[in-house]
Amino acid sequence: MRLDKSKEVFDNTKRYIPGGVNSPVRAFKNLSITPPVISKGKGCRIFDIDGNEYIDFVLSWGAMILGHCDPDVVNRMKEVVEDQIAFGAPTEIEYKMAKLVCETAQIDMVRFVNSGTEATMTAVRLAKGYTGKKKIVKFAGCYHGHHDIFLKEAGSAVAELRLKRIDEDIVQNTIVVEYNNLDSVEKAFKENKDEIAAVIIEPVAGNMGVVPAKKEFLQVLREICNLHGSLLIFDEVITGFRLSLKGARALYNVEPDLVTFGKIIGGGLPCGAVGGKKEIMECLAPQGNVFQAGTMSGNPIVMSAGYATIKKLKENPHFYSNLEMLAGKLEKELTQVFSNSNLTFCINRVGSMLTIFFGVEKVENFEMAKMSDLDLFRSFAEYMIKNHIYVPSSQFEAMFLSVAHSENDVEKFVEIAEEFCSSKRK
């Protein structure tokens, strides 16, 4: 596979953009190949400027659940852009989008922002304002965006790259505990009695690789928060509208006080949201005294793309069952391939998101994820990409499927994975 044009553009870009990218994980820093410079996407395919075609299992890090450039989403955006781009003023589509999100995700109220980071940042500020407490509990390996308070023992690119330590003064009110470990949580509450405003968690972690929370863990976490007057925040930036219309909450039957959204909610455009119980949400300005603002928040183009996406998900009763069937096929056939190759591995999958871990048989938290064979995963990722299967370059990111993928696409993934295993036996 040739990447001559991509290399030229990428090298030139580094003169003007630090590292050549606007988000670190895109740089393929842990691989020996140049990141393909993408020029087009359609369905589950993306194309680079060198003319290479890939089956995409990254999907803009999970955002493109309908596939790239879904016609209904594109047409809705075209209709709007003729008359509306951004006003910094109320628009009718904000109301329609808010109503759709609240009814579909079963929350009382929602506030739109511009990214998942803004959503989690707003949720924590709101929790502190509502409870009058200062500290938050987060889990090692969970990634809640690039705001300073969340970068303590975070997943995603933070785990992969050697990054400068953040100012300890900024994170002094951030308590980090172990994912899926109730003793760790109970110890934090015991040592910080009446000081914890909220616990924030990815109910299915996606940035230490895919690692689902245990059902009983989330249930007891809900009870602990109730007991101590702390809010429970589900970060569903990845899982919101991906695992079901109600996100991961439908899988666990656990209701948080606040939930954050991103990725899918914007239909592929920059968008985030925080939603939840009315009595808490009404603390946001201008109704309450917890400040949040954004010039581009709720702009008509983003709202239109998000509305078209969620409406399409809602109107297709077989959407999630079809995705489950396809992802299940991928998991089953990969399991067979790796087993036949006598590899030690585990595949963590929830719905249409999954991660392959080599060198370990079980991954339930960040420490276990870090014990996996990172070098073998890098070799796997590089081999897959060179053979036109676009997967994350990092062990600590998830793979995703979309409605645009077919059984043939899954079979091609499995075929290349089998070739990779054969190459390792030589």
UniProtKB/Swiss-Prot annotation:
<protein>
    <recommendedName>
        <fullName>Glutamate-1-semialdehyde 2,1-aminomutase</fullName>
        <ecNumber>5.4.3.8</ecNumber>
    </recommendedName>
</protein>
<dbReference type="Pfam" id="PF00202">
    <property type="entry name" value="Aminotran_3"/>
</dbReference>
<comment type="pathway">
    <text>Porphyrin-containing compound metabolism; protoporphyrin-IX biosynthesis; 5-aminolevulinate from L-glutamyl-tRNA(Glu): step 2/2.</text>
</comment>
<dbReference type="GO" id="GO:0030170">
    <property type="term" value="F:pyridoxal phosphate binding"/>
</dbReference>
<keyword id="KW-0627">Porphyrin biosynthesis</keyword>
<dbReference type="GO" id="GO:0008483">
    <property type="term" value="F:transaminase activity"/>
</dbReference>
<dbReference type="GO" id="GO:0042286">
    <property type="term" value="F:glutamate-1-semialdehyde 2,1-aminomutase activity"/>
</dbReference>
<comment type="subunit">
    <text>Homodimer.</text>
</comment>
<comment type="similarity">
    <text>Belongs to the class-III pyridoxal-phosphate-dependent aminotransferase family. HemL subfamily.</text>
</comment>
<dbReference type="InterPro" id="IPR004639">
    <property type="entry name" value="4pyrrol_synth_GluAld_NH2Trfase"/>
</dbReference>
<dbReference type="InterPro" id="IPR015422">
    <property type="entry name" value="PyrdxlP-dep_Trfase_small"/>
</dbReference>
<dbReference type="InterPro" id="IPR015421">
    <property type="entry name" value="PyrdxlP-dep_Trfase_major"/>
</dbReference>
<keyword id="KW-0663">Pyridoxal phosphate</keyword>
<keyword id="KW-0413">Isomerase</keyword>
<dbReference type="InterPro" id="IPR005814">
    <property type="entry name" value="Aminotrans_3"/>
</dbReference>
<dbReference type="InterPro" id="IPR015424">
    <property type="entry name" value="PyrdxlP-dep_Trfase"/>
</dbReference>
<dbReference type="GO" id="GO:0006782">
    <property type="term" value="P:protoporphyrinogen IX biosynthetic process"/>
</dbReference>
<keyword id="KW-0963">Cytoplasm</keyword>
<feature type="modified residue" description="N6-(pyridoxal phosphate)lysine">
    <location>
        <position position="263"/>
    </location>
</feature>
<dbReference type="GO" id="GO:0005737">
    <property type="term" value="C:cytoplasm"/>
</dbReference>
<dbReference type="InterPro" id="IPR049704">
    <property type="entry name" value="Aminotrans_3_PPA_site"/>
</dbReference>
